[in-house]
Every structure is written in C-alpha cells, then in structure tokens.
Amino acid sequence: MTSHTLNELIAEGVRGRYILVRSDLNVPLDGSTVTDDGRIKASLPVLAKLTDAGARVLVTAHLGRPKGAPEDKYSLRPAVDRLAELAGFKVTLAADTVGDSAREAAASLQDGEALVLENVRFDARETSKDDAERGAFADELVALTGANGAYVDDAFGAVHRKHASVYDVASRLPSYQGDLVHTEVEVLRKLTADTQRPYVVVLGGSKVSDKLAVIDNLIGKADTILVGGGMLFTFLAAAGHKVAASLLEQDQIGVVQDYLKRAADAGTEFVIPTDVVVAEKFAADAAHETVAADAIEASSFGANGIGLDIGPDSAAAFADRIKGARTVFWNGPMGVFEFEAFSAGTRAIAQALTETEAFTVVGGGDSAAAVRTLGFADDQFGHISTGGGASLEYLEGKELPGLSILDR
C-alpha cells in the first residue's frame, strides 16, 4: 500500500481542524542553547504548510532519553524557542504533554497557530512495551484533536520506534506521511533499489556492533565499503594486526572475519585504512603521529597508543573511491572530529562528497553533526538524513513501525 501524503490532507481542507504532527526536535544542546538546528529547520516546511492552510497544529516531539518523568534538562523549551525564531507563525509550548496545561492551551489555539506539547518521553507510557499503556497515552493525545482531527508523521528519526506518538496515534486517526518522511523514504529507496553504480558506502563511528546488521545487508549490494572510525580497529584485529590501546571489540573479531570472507565471495570490497593517526591519550591536545595501520604498536606510544583518526594516505584513497562513485552513503565519522587534531579524516570524506558527481547521502546522527561542525553547508550534499538509527534500520531491511502503520 501507499501512504497518504500531506498534500492530500491539505486538499481535503484543514482550516479550523486540529492536526497532530509528530516532528523531530531531538537536537543537541549546550545547556539551553541549540548547537545544531538542522532538525528544527527540517521540520518547518510541514508546520508552515499546515498553519498557512489554517490548521490548528499540535506538535509532539521528544528530546533525549528522560526516564518517563519530567526533567528540566530534557525540556523542549530551547528547541521551541529556536523554532519560534525561525517560524513565520505563532508557536507556543505547553507546560505538559496531556495534562491540564496542554488541554487548556489546545482549546485556546487559533487557526494558523502551532502548540508544541512538552517532551512526550516525560510520560513513561510513550515508550512502554505494553500495548495497552501506549494505547492509553495515544488516546489522550488524540483527544486533544477533537472530532475531526488528523495525524501527520514528519519525524523520520523516530519511525523505527514503536512508540505511542509515532505508532499508536497513527492507528487512531486518519494518518498522513509528512514531506520530510516522504523525502527520506524516497532517498533511501535509491540506496536499496535501482542504485546507480559504483555504489560506495562509508562506515565509521565507534563500534562495529552498532553496524552489524547494516553491514550484513550491504554485502552483495554495495560495490565498496570504506571502513573508518573506531570500528576500523576491530577490522584490523580481524586481519591479524595489533591495535595497541585503540578501541577494540574482541567479541566481534570472528564476525568481522566472516563478513570479509562473505564479501569477497559476493563481490563487495572492504577497504581498510593503511595508515592511522595514533595519540598518546584521548584528549584534544594529545601528542600524536601517523603510522602504518599494520604497525600501530611501532608508534612512539607503543602498546599505549590510541588510534583516533584515519591517516592522510587513507583519507586520500577513500576520497578517490568516492569521486569515482555514482552513489555514496556515509554513516559515521572517520575519527574524533570534535578534536581538531583528529578531524582531518572526517573533513576529507565530507570534502570528497561535495566534489563527486555521485548522488550523496549523509546518514544522519554524528555524520550530520560532523559536516556542520566542520563548516559544510547542507546544500553541498545530495541529502542529509534526519534519522541516524532509522536510516540504518531501513538499510538493514527492517520493517519500521512508524512507516508500516501509515501504509495500513
């Protein structure tokens, strides 16, 4: 089946109707300051379309991982303040999610205005494994919309969660796919069906264990998988090399060895760095040097050395692979990009993506934060996903509850 779209909803007429929108406002904060407003900006078009059409918009969202109760540090206030600065319509924040404040604020909402309900994860029922508990919370959210409400899912970063505001609400209201979710799905389909080749995947980040399922599904589909980040050291260990004090998942070495064998049989090439930047300690000002990837313990720091970035030769080789591709998907930084001394590998990958003629997708999460932190603009890439975990699970071939419920 095909999901109904936002344009279909607007064509039906939304003036004066309460439209419940699940947005993605899960942004990084430094105290009360939003440090990356990419997801807020991405949520604006749908909210603007609805308010322009006269809808009374109720926004649900989460921030962080509160433990089922209100915590000031996880309030949506900073995100909503930024949203209000960017929006061309009135935006307010309710003091709670489904309590008296939310009900009163919703009742006083006017056509063309938006009300953001406080963090849905302040209510333990949002993420409950119990269907009845989640359903009860969803019923309270739906009650805010009155007799002629509708639901729009525009939070791609949450579609892999079977949560009340994502899944259960959609089963209780006429439901529609937001433009952001629609775009994300269309982009990711290009990575899984009729993909333009050569198809190069760049995988980084800390742990192999976080990427096992996506690696498994990419074998035989991707032409080349470039490996960086902390996970590269488990690949080096699988090839029989010592990695000193670098991050190593000992229990995944056998799994990686199996992947390498299967990939060779399936025609997928794994490319592992030939040089790495090794540091004396994990710190921004740590002494460091570049060494061959198969001789990490030969660095000045011996067995205490910690690999914190791919080396310049590897970065150049990876860039060449990217520039020769037709499709590129990147998920995970190549090193500790937050430290300037260990950001060169990640910067090189980002730069290569901006220079290739390939269709490029930056897979959300740390990768999206990295390109922005390093000074790249979103429009320099084909697409920057708003969903890190959701993007990976889509590429793993998993059914995503928040999408499947829209297709019912």
UniProtKB/Swiss-Prot annotation:
Compartments it resides in: Cytoplasm
Gene Ontology biological process terms, A to Z: gluconeogenesis; glycolytic process
Catalytic function, reaction form: (2R)-3-phosphoglycerate + ATP = (2R)-3-phospho-glyceroyl phosphate + ADP
A molecular function (GO) term: ADP binding
Pathway assigned to this chain's UniProt record: Carbohydrate degradation; glycolysis; pyruvate from D-glyceraldehyde 3-phosphate: step 2/5
GO CC annotation: cytosol
Pfam family, one: PGK
Uppermost EC category: transferase
InterPro entries associated with the record: Phosphoglycerate_kinase (IPR001576), Phosphoglycerate_kinase_N (IPR015824), Phosphoglycerate_kinase_sf (IPR036043)
Top-level taxonomic group: Bacteria
Main location: cytoplasm
Record key words, sorted: ATP-binding, Cytoplasm, Glycolysis, Kinase, Nucleotide-binding, Transferase
EC number: 2.7.2.3
Binding site for substrate: 24-26, 39, 62-65, 121, 161
Coiled coil regions in record: none
Binding site for ATP: 211, 307, 338, 364-367
Subunit structure: Monomer.
UniProt record similarity statement: Belongs to the phosphoglycerate kinase family.
Protein name: Phosphoglycerate kinase
Organism of this sequence: Pseudarthrobacter chlorophenolicus (strain ATCC 700700 / DSM 12829 / CIP 107037 / JCM 12360 / KCTC 9906 / NCIMB 13794 / A6)
